[in-house]
A protein has these predicted regions:
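Glycine-rich phosphate/dinucleotide-binding loop and adjoining beta-alpha-beta core of small-molecule
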Residues: 1-131
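Short, small-residue alpha-helix embedded
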Residues: 85, 138-150
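Short pre-catalytic strand/loop immediately N-terminal to key active-site residues, enriched for Gly-Thr
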Residues: 128-140
């Protein structure tokens, strides 16, 4: 299902007439202040599991208080730059993974770090998918991953 908004310039409301079994959100919705307000209102009333990518992650990065509104086991799917915005700069790969584990634990979320070797972090554990290839660095492949997880 795809939701539309009456405002052609930005998303100003996010609502459903039915209770979805899961919601994938963030791809292409922008980060305008009105969209952030709509995202906040959605998170405050949402009862469905979430998969958050792209601009959804960017809104969480700029508004860290929104992390407290996420349902347990929400899936976040950042690429490296989105991850940096979310957890800050890291010194090395070990530091990066420690920061992601801390985020996952504090907010009870699942983090899928997209890359040549995608890494899933949850409950203090790391799961590494070594089957990736350079073809996954194609624009839109992360959007497809979000759809598959959703």
């Amino acid at each position: 299902m795809v939701l539309t908004c009456d405002d052609e310039q930005m998303i100003t409301s996010i609502s459903f007439q039915t209770q979805p079994s899961v919601v994938g959100i963030g791809i292409g919705i922008g980060t305008h202040a009105k969209t952030v307000s709509a995202f906040r209102a959605f998170l405050e009333q949402n009862k469905s599991p979430l998969v958050i990518d792209a601009d959804g992650i960017n809104m969480l990065s700029k508004n860290k208080d929104l992390l407290k509104l996420l349902p347990i086991q929400t899936v976040l799917t950042p690429h490296p730059k989105e991850l940096e915005r979310l957890i800050g700069v890291w010194k090395n790969d070990f530091d990066k993974l420690e920061k992601v584990k801390a985020l996952s634990k504090e907010h009870n979320v699942i983090v899928v770090i997209k890359g040549a070797n995608s890494i899933t972090v949850f409950d203090g554990k790391l799961y590494i998918n070594t089957t990736g290839n350079p073809g996954l660095a194609t624009a839109g492949s992360g959007d497809v991953l979000t759809g598959i997880i959703t």
